[in-house]
Structures are given as structure tokens and as C-alpha cells.
């Protein structure tokens, strides 16, 4: 079952120190700054309505600074009142382990000083932090308040409040370890044993953990302004596992890419003089997030307008003006707004529209084409008659239709009707015609849909059929002159004209191609048939009449230019490994995109397509990653015994030493997509490497981006050859890299990769452990039960069914080979997964349990195919890391702490 637990950095365990700890580490290295003068508020001696004067405790607990995302370092200045700067100084403790906070500078005003240290842990550890001082202080660890001491002892003054741990002032419970007494007290002698103490129980994963202590000294206090801190731990750990230091350099952790402001998209204005950038920010500790869009000028990056806190959506540029339109919603009804950014004028175009589902401007800005969704019937019936496989999905009975708003007059016109949804593709450059499609199920021929493409003259309402009864769908956009359509679809979209595979093979229609379709005579030119990369998106630019293709090129995602006159492709240097999205100015040779290098977080760029020069537009991550170090990422390919070249790459730890031996994680998907060079992937390879693992990522045959023949190997394979390629690749990688420990190799994958993980463990004992997320154990049950099982199988298992292909549905299903598994396997799945139902993991778990094989199953409550809820993703991530540590590092403590075996018998 899913374990409801937040980020397990800090746990409030009510355990006396003497029961858990055998050893301790003194925090001996500190950064300090101060003293900083503060003031009591006016009338602080006057009792409030509860009869209490303003106390030193209240002054201490007032947040003078925002310490979120603040990382002290020696020589860096802390900015105080009136812009005064105070440098952080490196300090060491005296022989008794005490550090001086600061030399007090005033006897008539209260003062604060700040101490900071970075606790480096080389593995997950459990222990207890103890802090001692004669003065008042508060402590934060990784940005969370962990304790407050509001007493003064000895010559410092009289006690005025109780000490406590945690955030009790905010209603959170914590263990009251303020007056810890243990067997060590007899030995404390020299450690000023009369000082009050604050303790807090810790659980720290591998990495750096920032401890900041704010100390307050009231006027005329006389005791030494000093602090003693130590971390106690039990015999499972060693002193080398816990090292306080003042260097903020660290490795990537899960919060680096879960938290902070992240840029999600950037869109240039029509003339390229402005750009709209969209952001997303998580709001921990909740599962909520906020999104917003800002408009900037290109020339000086000045903010033109911010829509933060405006609750808008669907923001788009008008085609020919520095103006945007967007929608707001109230009580289920939508209002469409327009905002002229040159004049500042705002106006409402349509108001209180029911069931609004989208909009698009005509290029001449005369019309707004919008979509209304009509709700289907019968979804709340207790006895529901299913009208085909798609009817299991909640939205299948809904229908969407097209409407037109005449912007000048405000007159609205309905454009389409019927029993099939009409999906808008594009509007012609002159604003007169639009292209739309309809789709309907056809269960007698794969891929079980038929598609029609239409063109409508919006002045006469005359509608012509461009394509009828097409088995494979296409997406289309008009050429700049309106004479052609740029179509994207699979190799079989227009028959065999787009296929480039040997005789006898079946094309992989997830390998998207680009075509030029003539509206005058219906002829089709397959422009990418000899182009190995797969098409992610395509744009026929009116500014230069060239086609720009964002393409999956092996494990990269790159930008290519197709010269429509010379009919050739050029690679454009974007400076990135993986572009997540790109948008183009409609009237200028300017584009803007978001992407990343393999070892650098995403940033937003602009590129001038005339000379292919680029500039950074938005960088929200560099400061957050300023102290994060990464290891090397290197390419590594091998020639399989089949003669195919199998591509791959591997990630090394930041402190890599070729003379050492490292555990290895092999990550594979094995399906139709390569594992791209993304940075914040759900399976973050550079984070795994930062935890002391070598991560080998390979791209077996069947992946797109390597040419159609390579991708077609996915069809009717289901691991027949791919499993051997992965095993062979692992063996050859280990042989070629002496620093990779062959006895400590794990394998992981998700979805199809989860299926491959299970299948691999039925074929070999090469791996020490495996992790399968949302994997398929029984191809037949996935085919019949998953929402898209049968339709995905239309490509992956073309013309093969459970009744005619035992060699796939039985022989390649891990469930039927479960008795061959000897390797510990972790099965993870969302308990609400509609793509690969959780039963796929449950079946394999049941089989392995009954066989007495080592297996664990975690169901993540309320999650679908991907784990996206903030706090659940953190716990899911920790489960993965704890499993790796247990089986590849012989460090079971983290896993056992998270998932103790209560039913061991």
C-alpha cells in the first residue's frame, strides 16, 4: 500500500537519545555572520490584550530574513537593514566543541547572529541533532524550522519560556527534547553542561543539508555567545557517513527540480519584438502549484505586463499585432479577453460562454474560431452499456464542434454539427478556409480508427473532402501561400509512399514523418522518407518559406531546417541537447524555445533564423544549481551480435575515481521511444549518479530517431530481440569499464520499460535487482484491460492477437515465466493507472510471492500512469533510492525505515 509520509528528511521521533545512539559527531566547522542589531517594537513593555508584554521569545521568532533558497558561503555578504552588508566568516570550534557566534557590539540593544553549516551525508542516515547555548536560538534544517530555545541560563539571564522542537507556533507537533538528559552528561564536564539544549531526530538522505541557527542576545547579557552542536548516531553508521563542512557544493537532489520557479514555454510576438514566457512553481508542503505568464520586450528584457495571480488560461498572441487573447472562467462559464500591449487597451470579445474548449485566430484577425464541447449522456448510469472500447473513457461520449466569432461585429456562427467531433487543424492564410477532421472507431481493421479530412469555405460553407477513410491520422497546417498542407503522421499515413523499410517489415507508425499535400491535385511528397530523425513538430514559416522541424534525433531533440527550394535538411545549432518546445514569430524569422543540456537545467532561448544566432531569454535555474556539481556524461555504443549498432550513454558520479568500483544502474525503455537527454526526467539519471551510481542508458532496436528500419523492429517484438540486446549491452558495458562492479548491477524501466525489466529477470541472473514501474506482466490482460492496450497493440502487435499468437502473448509475457525469476524485484504502480492497470504489477507480485521469490509491491494511492502529485512523488522517489541502496550498496536501513515488514513470519 502507499505509505502516507512527507519528505523524510526530519522525523519527530519521541526517543531518548541514550536508547538509539552510540556515537556522535561534533559540528566543528561553521559559517557565522553578525552581530546584527535589532530593536524591540514600540510599547514592548506594555501588556497586550492577554496581559503579556513583548518577550525576547517573540523577538527571536520574528522572521527578520527569508532564509528560503539562501545558501551561505565564506566571503558572501548577508544584507541587513539599510543595505548594510555583513560577511559570512569561516569559524572552527574550540577544544570543547563550542563556536563563538559573534563579539557583541552593544549592551543597550538586542542583537542576533547567524551560524550555518552544511551536513554532508554519504548515505542515508538516522540520528539526532543536539544544540546547546546559554542564549535564545532557532534552528532550520533544509529550510524547515526544527527547534526553538527561548531560555537563557547562567549569567545570560533568567528563563522566560520553554524550549521546544519543531514548529509548535504553527500548530505542528514535535518532540520536546529541550531538556535532554542522558548518560553522556557525566562526561560533559567541560561542555558547559548547564546550558539548555534543543534536540531533533533526523533522517537524512545522501547529500548536503543546510543547518542555519539564528541566535539572539538580549541587552546586558554576559554569558559567552556560543553554540555547541552534535549529531548522535547508532552502530549502523560511521563518522565518515556524517561530515559537517562549510562548502556549499553538493549533488543534485529531488528538490532541485521539484521546487523553484521553472520556465515551461516561451512564445514570441508576431514581429519578434516581445515574448510571452510561462512559469510554474510548486507550493510545498502542499500538492498545489501556481502558473502564470509574463510579457517582456526582446531588446531590453523589460517587463511589459505580468498575468501572475490573474487566473487566466489559453493565452496566445494575435497573428499580426502585439496583442494577446486569453480566457477567464467563472461558475463554469468562459470569457474571452483581448489585451493590446502597445496601447494597454483591454476588451472582452465573448462573455459567459458555456462548455468553451479552445480558440484560434484567423491569420487576418477578422475571426476567432472556437470550440464548444457538448456533454455526452449516460455516464452516471448504474448499469452502463459500453458502446465500444473507447466508451470506457469518461470523455468518449462528449462531442466538440466549431464556431466562428466575427470580431468586428460580435456576430457568432456555428460551423459544424453532427454525431462526430470536428477537430480544427488550421485556418488558411487569407482567413477564408479552414481544415478540420473527424474520426470514428472501426474495429475491423487496425489501428481501429478511420479518419476524414475536410476543407470548408467559411463564406459559402461549401465543404470538400480531402482525405476519406484514412486508417492512420495526420495533423495538417497550411503552407504560407495556402496552396499546400504540411502534414505529419506515421510512415503509413499515405500508404507506402512514406515508408522506408525492407520488404516483409511492418512500419512503426509512431515514427512520425512529414509530408507536403497539394490542395490542387492531391499529390503527396514525403519529405522525410530518407530522413532518420522522427518528427516531433513541424512549422512552415511564412517569413522565409522554409519548414522547421523539431526532431527526435537518436536520443537528442534537435531543430532542423528543410529548404523547400533545395529540398534538403540543415541542422540548426541551438546549443542544447533536448528542446522540449518551440514557437515561431508569425511575421519575423525569430523563434523561441525551452530546452536543456544533458547536465544543465532548462532555459529559454531566442534564435534568429536568418543567421541562426541565439540568446538566453530566461534562466530560472542557474542560481538554484549554482552549487550543484555533476559528473561526466559519455556516449557508449556497441555492435550487437545481430549486427545492429546500439546507442547509449552513461553518467558518472561527480567525484568519480576510475580506480574505484561503483554499482551500476541500467535504465532502458525498450519500446518505441528513445530515452531522451532530458534533465528533470521522472528517473533523473544525474541524480542517481550523484548518489554514487554509474547509470548506463541504452536505446535498443525499435526506438524512433534512428531511421524507419530501426524503429520498425518494435513491431511484433515484445522483447524477442530487445531483451538479448539489453543483456548483451550490459555485459559488454561491464567488460569495457573496469570501474563498473559486475556484482552490483540493477536494471529499471517504466511502462514498456517496466515490462522489459520483468522480462529481463526471467532471462538472466546478471542483475542484482530490478525496479519496474507500471510494467506489463501479461500482454493479453494489458491488451484487453488498459484503456489504450488494444490500440497500442495495433502497432506493437500488428495483426497479432491472443488467439493466434501464443509466441507473443504467452511466451513473451513475464507472468508465464515468473518461475525463472531469482532476482529481487520492486514493483511500483499508481493504483489508478488506466494505461497499464495496476493488476499488471499485482499479478506478477502474486506469482513471485507464491513462488517464494524476493519481491515487493508499492501501490501509490490516487496516481495514474505517472506519479505527479508533489508529496507522493517525493515518497515514490525515496522508495526507489532506498531500494537501490539496499540491493546495490548493502545499505538496507533506509528501505527498512520506510517499509518495515510488520508481517514477517
Descriptions of predicted regions:
Residues 18, 22-98, 118, 210, ...:
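Accessory carbohydrate-binding/adhesion or oligomerization-edge regions at the termini
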Residues 141-228:
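Beta-strand-rich ligand-recognition modules
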